[in-house]
Amino acid sequence: PYVTLKWAQNTDGNIHGHISTPLTSMLVHRERARHDAILVGSGTVIADDPSLDNRLYAGSSPLRVVLDRRGRVPAGVRVFRDDNVVYYSEAERADLPSVVKTAVYDSLPGVLSDLYNRGVTSLLVEGGAEILKCFIDSGLYDAVRVEVSPAAVATPPVAPLLPKSPSWIEQLDGNTLYGF
């Protein structure tokens, strides 16, 4: 699939906490509507219990993809609310809702291949920091969208660093958007 990495951070590089504005949140949901699937790691699901759907823009919600190598994500999280989710883990999970599609996690290229075989041609990777760094270090991405807010965030995790310059920069609602 065509892989887009997306995250929001403050000027210190911290990505934890609420960073997006109402307008930039709507743009995130537009990106979700334009992608077949959205991927996050177990840390993001455990910390934020996100819905990973499209509520703020016209269009459908993407397939939700959760990478959880060690089987740490609780069975009652919002991403498991219906059958529009694929869960990758090295651990066996008998406690997940029966609607959740499960697959064995072997590698990022293996996950991308499996998603492609499921009909996914575009994937939005929203984090967290560890997952984003893995995609960057592996070179398994086609585009990157970064939102930077001047607002302070209390603690790490720290956003990954990209080894290239942005192809576009846009000021929007007090935040700066970068495209790579």
Region locations from a protein language model:
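Beta-strand secondary-structure signal
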Residues: 4, 124, 177-179
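Active-site ligand-binding patch in enzyme domains
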Residues: 2-122, 130-133
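Glycine-centered flexibility sites
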Residues: 13, 41, 127-128, 139, ...
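Helical hairpin unit composed of two closely spaced alpha helices linked by a short loop
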Residues: 120-123, 127, 132, 138, ...
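Active-site lining segments that contact anionic ligands and/or coordinate catalytic metals
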Residues: 62, 120-122, 141-143, 175-177
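Conserved histidine-centered catalytic loops in small-molecule metabolism enzymes
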Residues: 108, 156-180
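Short Gly/Pro-enriched turn/cap motifs at secondary-structure boundaries
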Residues: 18-19, 125, 168-171
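Flexible, gly/pro- and Lys/Arg-enriched active-site loops
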Residues: 136-167
